[in-house]
């Protein structure tokens, strides 16, 4: 089988969340960080025939890049990558070294929904980098919800700071849900977004079967 560019993109994103991944037979990929404060699940076009434990996902992706448009044969203990006369045997890790992602869909607690475009996500990531922002602040005030990216007042001692703002729409209640920038590791795409009173943010892509659950700062008020 060949691994599509879309699936490689997802694996690259997952590698920023956790260096290891345990792939079950089928077409579902899932990951979480060690805390866990980030969880993600994706449905891909490939059908993995066996259980695949990869301890160093960056190394596996590097091997794929090295072999180019190769065929990958996922066997019981190894993956065999072939391209013309070239071949690589990539040995799986011991499954005990790779923790399986636990994806449990929370129910209830939703209090605000909005939509992010692919461009919104890219701009949010750029703004966080440009302003060295520690958090993304989702603020509901006077019936208007806004995403604010800058230095929170509590950390800035009320001095002026550069701030990027994105109006998200109308809201019922006041809130301040803070998502640490370090957990906002999402692939730019179009997303339906849900903020939850259990202090997390949920994103579901509208263009591909990809979902994220991101934990908020415990000091958030909702």
What does each model-identified segment do?
Residues 1-93, 109-222:
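DNA polymerase processivity clamps
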Residues 102-107:
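Secondary-structure "cap/kink" motif recognition
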